[in-house]
Each structure stands twice: as C-alpha cells, then as structure tokens.
Curated annotation (Swiss-Prot):
Active site, UniProt feature: C45, D167, H169
Broad enzyme group: hydrolase
Gene source species: Homo sapiens (Human)
Subcellular localization(s) per the UniProt record: Cytoplasm, Cytosol
Protein name (record): Ufm1-specific protease 1
Amino acid sequence: MEPLRDVHVGLSPPSRGPVRLALLSGHYLYYHYGCDGLDDRGWGCGYRTLQTLCSWPEGQPAGVPGLAAVQAALEDMGDKPPGFRGSRDWIGCVEASLCLAHFGGPQGRLCHVPRGVGLHGELERLYSHFAGGGGPVMVGGDADARSKALLGVCVGSGTEAYVLVLDPHYWGTPKSPSELQAAGWVGWQEVSAAFDPNSFYNLCLTSLSSQQQQRTLD
C-alpha cells in the first residue's frame, strides 16, 4: 500500500495574528514505522524521514530506497563498518545527506545547531528555505534523538514561532490525512516546546538537485 501523500494539507495556521508563514513546495509521501511491512519501531525513524525526503518533490515512491538498500549503500561507501547491513542501528541527518546524493534524490544541505541554542536562531533560515521553494527538512539530535521532518514555519509577533512537524513514529495503517492530523502525527508545534534546549540538532534541508531542476525545465 502506497504511503499517504501531502498529509499536512487542510491544517489551519497556528496563529491568527499577523504572521509570516511558509510551507514546502512540491509533494511528498508520509513514510512511518512499519509502512512497508518491516517492524522498525525503536530504530527506524531516521530511515523513514529519509524516505519522505527522497519522495520529494513529485510525491511518488519511484526512487525511494528501502531500509536494506540504505544500509547497504552506507556500508559500501565506507560510512558504516562491515555488519551494518541488517542491523537496527540508527541513522541521522549526516547519513541522510549521503544517501540523498547516492540515490539521486534532492540535494541535502546540512546545518548544525549547537546544544542549548534551540531552533529560534534558525527560523529565518527555515523561512527563507521554504519561501524559496525548498523541500522537507530532516531534524535529529543527541539528547533528542527522535528524527522528524519539518514542512513549514510560521513566525508571529515577538517570540511567537511555530514549525510544522511530520512525525515518522506512527505505527499502523492511516486511512486519511485527517486521522493523522487529529492524532498529532502532523501538525504545528511551538518551537520552544518542540525542541529540547539540552540537545544539539542537525538539519538536512532539501532542495532540487541539478538533475531535478533539468527535469522540471524539460
């Protein structure tokens, strides 16, 4: 069963006041725990977020690698030691950026957010990314090791700021985007509540690769 597409569509903005709001361009598929029949609960969130990134911007499963293919690629390119294949070892944004290049997906640009800083200092970068046609942004940390994807940003007055979070930790077979929205698997979250100030974070910001740009022109 193909994953659901663009599951954030229909969500209301998080703030009613004057805001600057930017969402990702293009389309994506929502990959989550067990969506292909493999029980990866407890270790697969980084792989699932990577798969969502690979499905952008067409929102199609073609070209999206399975978990075994990701592990094989990382081992073959020397990023992981022999025996990584078939393991339950996690991956993060650095591995995701390597795999995006390896599998011919969108371009991935890494950004490091030091411990204790939080994402407030990255709001302008994220806003410019989404407003400029960027795709989903993978986020992962150390104290907060739960990988997730960001699909948009909303900056209000003062310190009010929200990010649109897509959580890959869902287990089951969702019937509709509204089901996921109601349960909070995709939704707007206040930045200070969504991210642990005691964790560093890596971001992997996706944009069209040169090959994808050429296909768009064609």
